[in-house]
Amino acid sequence: MFIAILDFQTAAADRPAALAQLETERGQIRAMPGNLAFRVYASREDDSTVTVVHEWQDEESFKPYLASEAFIRSGEVLRPMMTGSPVSRRFHAELLETVA
């Protein structure tokens, strides 16, 4: 499994628009081969941070996302709203179990 976590900040007034943009792209991203999850979170610690958590089958299935129209569109909309550089952390992970 491949996990990518993206954190970025916007002005407080821009965060709803940033969240809306990511929600707009969610369906297309979830439909991509190998995507297991795409979750967007507004920080409870402040009014400017947004976190996106991606889960993919593997790193190879993540790569087409980086070249996708959804990624490009979101970048065009989100980057001007960002008040600093985004931070993307990427992990290889092994699922041990799913407990329901």
Predicted feature locations:
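Short, well-ordered beta-strand segments in beta-rich or mixed alpha/beta enzyme
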Residues: 2-9, 39-66
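Short, surface-exposed ligand-recognition loops at beta-strand->loop->(often short) alpha-helix junctions
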Residues: 9-19
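Non-catalytic surface loops within mature trypsin-like serine protease
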Residues: 10-12, 58, 92-95
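Intrinsically disordered, low-complexity acidic/polar segments
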Residues: 15-17, 49, 61, 97
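An amphipathic, aromatic/His-enriched active-site/gating alpha helix that lines ligand/cofactor pockets
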Residues: 24-36, 55-88
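Glycine-rich beta-strand-turn "strand-cap" elements at beta-sheet edges
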Residues: 39-48, 76-100
